[in-house]
A protein has these predicted regions:
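Class I S-adenosyl-L-methionine
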Residues: 2, 63-73, 78-235, 241
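Extreme N-terminal starter segment of soluble prokaryotic enzymes
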Residues: 5-10
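Class I SAM-dependent methyltransferase "Motif I" SAM/SAH-binding loop
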Residues: 13-18
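Short beta-strand element of Class I
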Residues: 33-35
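Conserved SAM/SAH-binding beta-strand->alpha-helix loop
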Residues: 40
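Conserved SAM-binding loop
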Residues: 47
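Conserved SAM-binding strand-loop segment of SAM-dependent methyltransferases
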Residues: 53-59
Length: 296
């Protein structure tokens, strides 16, 4: 469904491959100026390929509110490695300290709407973010709109966000009928997967069932131990299948190596979840938080 809404200025921090722009485009929301802060050259290349009019403004540490026009929507997913179970688990002291850059830019721009995405984390870290943003997070699992298990927290002043309807998608629903041989597991990989871990073969830990949901895509899923393996087909997921798990159009990330495609998809957003949240801008005025009142 398309939504008749126009935004003059959108600012995306940690823009990656521009998932925010893709979600807005999915909703048919016109954006006159989309400012993107990102430093990964491969993600920037994909963003430029799909949205050549994007205004790239470099690293978040160099973004200054005084240099920007009035921002209608500020979005971002600050690096989550230090919060994530799959990452460093060092909280605010690791890479995730870039969250404070989001807070700084939020204060400097005082946007009409804002949205921050991050992984599930320790309650103490979640509470710090909630205190700084002035809104409580909403937990939405991408499994409702895709074939991927991906629970994420969303802090936003866009009101009345409900859970998306469950589409009932399974991994088998998004798989390609054919794939390149390079995605098949080697004999060495199959042997490794047959070894025991805690009394069970690794197949039990690293495989995705055809009649179930895929495990959460990660930025390092292309490294080392076979991850995202389809046991019934003895192969890994393809980049297009990972795009489908994130509800990204087929071959949106084409143009860089498979390694970089997997990385940016693992770092990215599930588009239909973001669109589900952003569509409420059409119907509801923003919640004015106490933090925003302090800036008036």
């Amino acid at each position: 469904m398309k939504y008749d809404l126009e935004l003059d200025n959108v600012l995306s921090l940690f823009d990656g491959m521009s998932c925010g722009q893709l979600a807005l485009d999915t909703l048919g929301i016109k954006v006159n100026n989309y400012f993107a802060s990102e430093i990964d050259p491969y993600a920037i290349k994909i963003a430029k390929k799909n949205y050549p009019n994007t205004k790239h403004i470099g690293s978040v540490v160099d973004v200054k509110g005084a240099d920007l026009p009035k921002i209608d929507l500020l979005i971002g997913g600050s690096p989550c490695q230090s919060f994530s179970n799959a990452g460093e688990r060092t909280g605010m002291d690791g890479k995730s300290k870039l969250f404070w850059e989001f807070v700084r830019v939020l204060k400097e721009t005082n946007p009409t709407y804002f949205l921050l995405e991050n992984v599930r984390m320790k309650k103490e870290w979640e509470n710090i973010i909630t205190e700084q943003l002035g809104v409580k997070p909403i937990l939405i699992n991408s499994r409702l709109v895709s074939a991927q298990n991906r629970p994420r927290l969303y802090w936003t002043n866009i009101p009345n966000i409900e859970q998306p309807l469950d589409r009932g998608l399974l991994l088998k629903d998004i798989l390609q009928e054919t794939w390149d041989d390079k995605f098949n597991l080697s004999e060495k990989a199959c042997d490794y997967m047959s070894r025991l871990r805690n009394g069970k073969p690794r197949w039990e830990y690293h495989t995705n069932p055809l009649n179930g949901k895929s495990a959460c895509l990660t930025a390092n899923m292309y490294k080392g131990v076979p991850y995202g393996v389809i046991k019934e087909q003895l192969r890994r997921l393809t980049p297009v299948e990972c795009e489908r798990l994130q509800t990204v159009p087929d071959n949106y990330t084409a143009g860089v190596s498979d390694t970089q495609r997997f990385k940016m998809l693992g770092n990215g957003w599930t588009i239909d979840v973001i669109a589900h949240i952003l569509m409420n801008m059409k119907y509801y005025e923003p919640v004015i938080t106490e933090k925003q009142l302090e800036l008036i």
